[in-house]
Amino acid sequence: MGKRLLDKLWEKHVVTTNENGLDLLYIDLHLVHEVTSPQAFEGLRLTNRKVRRPDLTFATMDHNIPTKDVWNITDRIAKQQLDTLRENCKQFQVPLADIGDEEQGIVHVIGPELGLTQPGKTIVCGDSHTATHGAFGALAFGIGTSEVEHVLATQTLWQRKPKAMGIELKGKLQKGVYAKDIILHLLSKYGVAVGTGYVMEFYGETIGAMEMEERMTLCNMAIEGGAKAGIIAPDEKTFAYVKGRKYAPRDYETFEKKWSELYTDADAIYDLHISIDVTDLAPYVTWGTNPSMGVRIDEKLPEKHDVNDERAFSYMGLSPGQSTYDIPVQHVFIGSCTNSRLSDLEIAAAVVKGRKVKEGVRALVVPGSKRVRDAAMQKGLHHIFEEAGFEWREPGCSMCLGMNPDQVPEGEHCASTSNRNFEGRQGKGARTHLVSPAMAAAAALYGHFVDTRKESYDGAISYS
């Protein structure tokens, strides 16, 4: 019987197996940020240990930093975490993309753009959305702070092998429908626990047509379906994306030959298989308080089925049967490790070019990295956004989570390109609606959601 991509990635990294069936995996890349690393470094210090492989470790600052005035950090805890990371990286000789550095940005944006993320690698980070890197054919997953310390000290991690889920995506997406809509559809249909105990492998003709940044969006949110990770077999697009980047292999041809062997064999069998035809897929909007609570833009909000729905409707200030077009939008956030790359900003800019943000709507564009920001500015995207009435910010996690100055006021609704819509995620009492960059940009123009499949966004307003 053939092997799945998961099998090939896993087997190449097993150092040993213990009596409980746990495998000790070697870790090829450890990404670090300021929030989940302080206790881990302190653990090394208390036990007089060193970082085993500083050359396989890379740190950045992203969660806590302000995106408006990056040097004016007024929150005491945030400043302490940033200062601590700076001190720890210096003491343990770990490379750091500090505030203002050309390599600084959201950890899951800079990994791929710097060429740190490569096919065949095992990649970990003390962050849920490490699965993003799986778009390159890497086995990437989030870990806890105690595990961060273990990897820093040993460059290994004890893990139990997950099962393999195959998700076949067929068909061609309509204009105005994106990878974000695919993953929101998947979650709305199968729920937030469908992937528990699995690694999701996305494949099929739809994947082949996607560019790398779209694939990253898919894998980024595999964790929202409960999966350990999301992976996609590398192909020519993957190889072309990695080639020539700062930390890409110098002996590139040798590596590309090895990478081309990373795929699921034709006779391999997945433990669970799902098939989705994306041909008739519509833009999605989440209405509730977890990512599976979403509907198509042309659907009404669902009926209440349990106490969770009851609580979600109450928190969000919405009602069953309500039109998605009637949901008010007071804030728009285009950013996060899900949708803050150059192609995401280009899509949003195309929607708002020559138009104006609706009066009363606050709209932010937060590039995922310094390099993304610079590239966008070279294309003049910042002018398009600013002329439309958006705020053009410095890179960081920003409004994705209520851990920095960028927050949504209590009781107000935000169209967000991020990945989580939990209660309080964007600030106390904030009401988050997950959408694609195009949907978020269009919502900024009208103060409510519209159908991005329409040639004229005005045509969507008459829906009832």
Swiss-Prot record:
Keywords noted in UniProt: 4Fe-4S, Amino-acid biosynthesis, Branched-chain amino acid biosynthesis, Iron, Iron-sulfur, Leucine biosynthesis, Lyase, Metal-binding
Entry-linked PROSITE patterns: ACONITASE_1, ACONITASE_2
Catalytic activity from the UniProt record: (2R,3S)-3-isopropylmalate = (2S)-2-isopropylmalate
Residues the record lists as binding [4Fe-4S] cluster: 337, 397, 400
InterPro entries assigned: 3-IsopropMal_deHydase_lsu, Acnase/IPM_dHydase_lsu_aba_1/3, Acoase/IPM_deHydtase_lsu_aba, Aconitase_4Fe-4S_BS, Aconitase_4Fe-4S_dom, IPM_dehydratase_rel_enz, IPMI_cat
Pfam families: Aconitase (PF00330)
Domain of life the protein comes from: Bacteria
Pathway(s) it belongs to: Amino-acid biosynthesis; L-leucine biosynthesis; L-leucine from 3-methyl-2-oxobutanoate: step 2/4
Co-factor binding details: Binds 1 [4Fe-4S] cluster per subunit.
E.C. number: 4.2.1.33
Keyword DNA-binding: no
UniProt-listed GO biological process terms: L-leucine biosynthetic process
Required cofactor names: [4Fe-4S] cluster
UniProt-recorded Gene Ontology molecular function terms: 3-isopropylmalate dehydratase activity; 4 iron, 4 sulfur cluster binding; metal ion binding
Described purpose of this protein according to its UniProt entry: Catalyzes the isomerization between 2-isopropylmalate and 3-isopropylmalate, via the formation of 2-isopropylmaleate.
Subunit structure of this chain's protein: Heterodimer of LeuC and LeuD.
Protein name as catalogued: 3-isopropylmalate dehydratase large subunit
